[in-house]
Regions:
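Predominant activation on well-ordered alpha-helical scaffold segments within soluble catalytic domains
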Residues: 15-19, 41-44, 64-67, 84, ...
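Electropositive, gly/pro-rich neighborhoods at or near active sites that engage anionic ligands
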Residues: 1-75
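Generic secondary-structure signature for well-ordered alpha-helical cores
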Residues: 19-28, 45-52, 71-75, 92, ...
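Generic structural signal for well-ordered, non-membrane alpha-helical segments
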Residues: 7-15, 32-36, 59, 63, ...
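C-terminal functional extensions of proteins
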Residues: 166-210
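Conserved mixed alpha/beta catalytic, RNA-binding, or beta-rich assembly cores of soluble enzyme
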Residues: 80-150, 156, 161-164, 172
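Glycine- and other small-residue-rich loops at beta-strand/loop junctions that grip anionic moieties
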Residues: 7, 55, 137-138, 161-164, ...
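Conserved, well-structured core segments that form the ligand-binding/active-site neighborhood
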Residues: 1-14, 154-157, 176, 199-210
Length: 210
């Protein structure tokens, strides 16, 4: 049985197929920039879902702001260990950044129990109090996104793509109406894998620009 075995070749072939399908099915579709294209295609690569051509929303200048923050040794806070695991931390470290996820932190577990809130909310409460430049990447917990907006703090960027049926669509809609520099998934779709793919696309773009 013959099949492609090299990881790089598999990925390259996948992106070739994605590009071909977009050209055939959406010949008039226009990407806003090479980075916008890279993000959309990487999310499609992750999900095999071409709806992402239409449901990924970007606030004005968010890509420039987010990439600039990544280059300034920012800390990325994720709502799940899955999102944290999916981000290319080796490449992130080359830009001086790091990832943190407090969902299982004893402080978070204790605060969530005492206050009767989700651990995702308690994790945000701790994260916003820490020093340094912050980026928030949420792919699973609408309550984390709602909580961040309740704090009304200044952050360098937010990836808000929680998936689900309870609060997911509403939290992302609220994000698009906030003052925060953000990338949001419109509707119910999303996920930790999507959140990580968006960050990785920016990191790979920055690596290529060096």
């Amino acid at each position: 049985m013959q099949y492609i075995q090299q990881p790089q070749a598999i990925e390259a072939k996948s992106f070739d197929i994605i590009g071909e399908i977009i050209r055939k099915t959406r010949p008039d579709y226009q990407f806003a920039s090479p980075l916008h294209e890279a993000i959309i295609k990487r999310v499609i690569h992750t999900t095999a879902d071409f709806d992402w051509l239409d449901i990924l929303w970007f606030s004005d200048d968010v890509l420039a702001q987010f990439c600039a923050a990544l280059g300034r040794s920012s800390v990325i806070y994720t709502d799940t260990t899955m999102a944290l695991s999916g981000i290319n931390k080796t490449l992130l470290a080359k830009f001086g950044g790091e990832c943190r996820c407090y969902i299982s932190d004893p402080r978070v577990v204790r605060a969530a129990k005492e206050q009767g809130i989700t651990r995702s909310m308690a994790a945000v409460d701790i994260a916003v109090q820490e020093e340094g430049e912050k980026l928030f990447v949420f792919g699973n917990a609408p309550t984390a996104l709602f909580r961040l907006m309740e704090h009304d703090v200044s952050v360098s960027g937010v990836v808000g793509v929680p998936v689900g049926f309870v609060g997911a669509e509403e939290s992302k809609d609220a994000l698009t109406k906030s003052h925060l520099p953000a990338i949001a998934a419109l509707g119910r779709k999303g996920g930790s894998n999507v959140a990580a793919a968006i960050v990785n696309a920016m990191l790979y773009h920055m690596q290529g620009a060096r």
